[in-house]
Amino acid sequence: MSIKFSFKDEVFSLDKLQLPSRHYHFNDNENYIKLLNIGEGIFPKDKIRTSLSLDNSNLIFTTESATKIYPSKKEYGIQKIDIVLKNNSNLEFINDELILYKDSRYIQFFNLKSDENSTFFYTDILSRGRSFENFDFSNMLIKNSFFCEKSMEYMEKFDVKGAELKDYINRKSSSNFIFAKIYIKTNNNEEFLNRIYLEKFESFTYTKNKKIILGVISSNNMFELKNQIFKIWELYRKELNKSKFNLGKQ
């Protein structure tokens, strides 16, 4: 199952839709796509691919709601996301949280390729599951790859078992159990990182070649966590001389 779309010179094109989903494209002031998966989740054996290309274009992209990963005895639900940015493009990908149900198994492949002058803001959020669960999923495998100017700039791999993550948080005696990872590329990363520090977000740093900024934030409240993300996103938009944007979600 897949969806593939692109923008060239700010013009939208839906290239493929073989996915039980709806997408909403708005263009009052900026290109904005909200993607709604029917059933709002990923089931065992699902293989979902999202492909996006921007050429001299800007896009704000988000999901309608949290992505639920349903239980499985042995099969994995798989999601693959491929993104290409070129010719001064800008992507702002505001992801809602993953909710891994008890006994769920999930694999994610995320690949982003950007040229020198394009920019992006991308977030991933992991919750502890449904309100009555506490990292009771079986296994989560993540591979995120970022390329800048055709060279690998950053890659991370996670093989996480719910029981191990729960044990780690308990040993750390942390009250926070919701985590967000943020990936940012601007045209002046040094200046933007200093701006983040001034706002008291301290868990941010560069990748090896300083072409991407990485950050982690955590909280025990989803509303509070998303407010932190939106604050950093607002700083990013100011860096691009853009005003605050309302996603129009609860």
Swiss-Prot record:
Task: List where in the cell it is found.
Answer: Cytoplasm
Q: Any coiled-coil ranges, and where?
A: none
Sorted alphabetically, which Pfam families does this protein's record hold?
UreD (PF01774)
Q: Where is the signal peptide?
A: none
The entry's cellular-component GO terms read: cytoplasm
Assembly and oligomerization: UreD, UreF and UreG form a complex that acts as a GTP-hydrolysis-dependent molecular chaperone, activating the urease apoprotein by helping to assemble the nickel containing metallocenter of UreC. The UreE protein probably delivers the nickel.
Q: Which PANTHER family match?
A: UREASE ACCESSORY PROTEIN D
Q: What's the protein name?
A: Urease accessory protein UreD
Q: Write down the species.
A: Aliarcobacter butzleri (strain RM4018) (Arcobacter butzleri)
Query: Corresponding gene?
Result: ureD
